[in-house]
């Protein structure tokens, strides 16, 4: 069985924004697709979709699924509308890739250690090894109107601190340049 986790790639990868499995052309090889509505879809909740015969068994054994409530109809309607828009948002997808490449290469040129060698996502992780430096940089960015998420142990390996820069297609070229200023 093959499961594809598209939490960070939905809306970003593939001709229709379905994710890495679509970009790699292996739709027929994937048995289960999981993802979240809280990132590119802009709502809450998540999903697991499948036509696999074992899908029902997963539904019966998956503790987070068993002990949760269904999403409200308004959230489902909003997520559905957002996904439909993502499927045809080719220009936005290209703009998002452009923004990610610009910020990634700019941060690398400034000497920051990043989580990947090239832009592979709309989330760019700046890796730091000093907690005080990470907190000070995070606070300075906030004070200057730039919001980034900071991740630290236990969410990261011991001694590793991340400033996670999340980009979107709506960032203008001027805003992208400000990120790098």
Segments predicted by a language model, with ranges:
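Active-site PLP attachment segment
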Residues: 16, 22-57
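Conserved PLP-binding catalytic core of the aspartate aminotransferase-like
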Residues: 94-103, 108-145, 155-160, 167-169
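Short, ordered loop/turn segments at secondary-structure junctions
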Residues: 7-9, 52, 72, 153-155
